[in-house]
């Protein structure tokens, strides 16, 4: 399923969403420069093993400290399909969440979502996948963007998403689109635990952790918006 647009018009100019997209593309073009994407990924990606080693990296490479790698990795991508897909999702769903949180709030919230997503993937990798899997660089904005999807899921339950499904374009409820997306992540994540070779290099638990962060914080925001104003008598 590929989202084309949603039905919720933005109330403000999404400066931060646009800025994040631009930043991701700037980093991607930097990755494409000499000495190439693979070298940049191995040098500047986030490694779960950096939390408490050892890391088994190719000769000549050293893992960044985790508190640096978690942010550099959040803006790096492995290929055109990777970055274009992520930025499409951020463009469609990010502006409405930014409307809700405000520009500055959304920026810090987005970064926090990315950190929580990386933490979820790190926990699963260290607990279940072993040392060698922990020495594989984790990159991509998808964990933070999964947070955006989770928040959108609870903040805009009546929204609809124009969706390309194979060769058919249909408008479907956002809760269906995002719910199916999450269930696919959970299913494939579970399969990857049972059969690690089937993971295809995708950080499913970063997606799951990011989405959960978005749902929880979105529910808190929704509850605050529904709270009645306190009346005081003098």
Where are these regions (language model features)?
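A detector for small-residue-rich transmembrane helices and their helix-helix packing motifs
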Residues: 1-234
């Amino acid at each position: 399923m590929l989202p084309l647009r949603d039905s919720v018009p933005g109330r403000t100019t999404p400066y931060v969403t646009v800025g994040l997209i631009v930043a991701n593309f700037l980093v991607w073009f930097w990755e494409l420069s000499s000495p190439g994407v693979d070298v940049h990924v191995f040098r500047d990606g986030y490694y779960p093993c950096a939390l408490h080693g050892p890391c088994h990296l190719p000769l000549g490479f050293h893992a960044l400290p985790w508190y640096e790698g978690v942010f550099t990795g959040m803006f790096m991508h492995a290929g055109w399909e990777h970055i274009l897909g992520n930025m499409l999702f951020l463009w469609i769903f990010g502006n409405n969440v930014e409307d809700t949180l405000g520009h500055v709030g959304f920026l810090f919230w987005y970064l926090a979502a990315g950190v929580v997503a990386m933490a979820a993937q790190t926990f699963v990798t260290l607990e279940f996948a072993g040392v060698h899997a922990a020495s594989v660089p984790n990159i991509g904005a998808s964990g933070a963007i999964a947070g955006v999807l989770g928040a959108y899921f609870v903040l805009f339950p009546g929204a609809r998403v124009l969706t390309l499904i194979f060769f058919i374009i249909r408008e479907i409820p956002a809760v269906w689109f995002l719910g199916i997306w999450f269930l696919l992540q959970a299913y494939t994540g579970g399969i990857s635990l049972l059969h690690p070779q089937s993971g295809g290099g995708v950080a499913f638990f970063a997606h799951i952790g990011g989405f959960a962060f978005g749902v929880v914080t979105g529910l808190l925001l929704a509850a605050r918006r529904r709270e009645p104003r306190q009346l005081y008598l003098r």
